[in-house]
Amino acid sequence: MAKTIKITQTRSAIGRLPKHKATLLGLGLRRIGHTVEREDTPAVRGMVNAVSYMVKVEE
């Protein structure tokens, strides 16, 4: 089984760049406090890195 990471949205997407809003939706995050589990792949890591100021990551 592939390694997974937990991603939690900690800040609002209101007023953010459209690309960053799209990245949050791509990760499956919709609201503050929402947590999702995703596979730990370079693509997901890149998305998390782009919106790192709005999310918290747990290994």
From Swiss-Prot:
GO annotation, biological process: translation
User: Gene Ontology terms, cellular component aspect?
Assistant: cytosolic large ribosomal subunit
What the entry lists under Gene3D superfamilies is as follows: Ribosomal protein L30, ferredoxin-like fold domain
Kindly state which keywords UniProt assigns to this record, in alphabetical order: Ribonucleoprotein, Ribosomal protein
Cross-referenced InterPro entries: Ribo_uL30_ferredoxin-like_sf, Ribosomal_uL30_bac-type, Ribosomal_uL30_CS, Ribosomal_uL30_ferredoxin-like
A Gene Ontology MF term for this entry? structural constituent of ribosome
What's this protein's family per the entry? Belongs to the universal ribosomal protein uL30 family.
Protein name in UniProt:
Large ribosomal subunit protein uL30
Give the species: Pectobacterium atrosepticum (strain SCRI 1043 / ATCC BAA-672) (Erwinia carotovora subsp. atroseptica)
The protein's gene is named rpmD
